[in-house]
């Protein structure tokens, strides 16, 4: 009898830990992706590309169709440029620091599909001015 109770208890603990572990995987968070993956996503369409550099930097060259939303302007309210919190958002800056910061802010604001593509300095594809 004691062995059965111990076995049943062990199974319950195992199942409980399994459920908790799976729940952690689905927590919201941004994902860091390489330039090639970001380019592939953009080629397929249905994404919003966000440049979080300053306006002067944006004007010197940016990824085609990227919208300018400076990191400093992302605050406590969802940006008007990003009305859909379920949209796929690709974020970049110059070196990757501000894109990480902006991605974290967007996740905290409730955006679900945020991808940090790092810095434009590592972008091997065309840019526009």
Model-predicted regions and their roles:
Residues 3-10, 14-47, 56-88, 94-129:
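Rhodanese-like catalytic fold shared by cysteine-dependent sulfurtransferases
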Residues 49-51:
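Structural scaffold elements adjacent to functional motifs in cytosolic proteins
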């Amino acid at each position: 009898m004691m062995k059965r109770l111990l076995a049943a208890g062990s199974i319950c603990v195992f199942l409980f830990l399994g459920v908790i572990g799976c729940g952690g995987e689905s927590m919201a968070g941004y994902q860091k992706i390489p330039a090639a993956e970001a380019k592939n996503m953009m080629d397929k369409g249905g994404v919003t590309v966000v440049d979080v550099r300053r306006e002067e930097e944006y004007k010197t060259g940016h990824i085609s169709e990227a919208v300018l939303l400076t990191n400093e302007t992302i605050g406590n309210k969802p940006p008007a440029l990003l009305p859909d919190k379920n949209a796929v958002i690709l974020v970049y800056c110059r070196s990757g620091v501000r894109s990480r910061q902006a991605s974290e802010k967007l996740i905290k604001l409730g955006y679900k599909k945020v991808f940090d593509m790092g810095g434009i300095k590592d972008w091997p594809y065309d840019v526009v001015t």
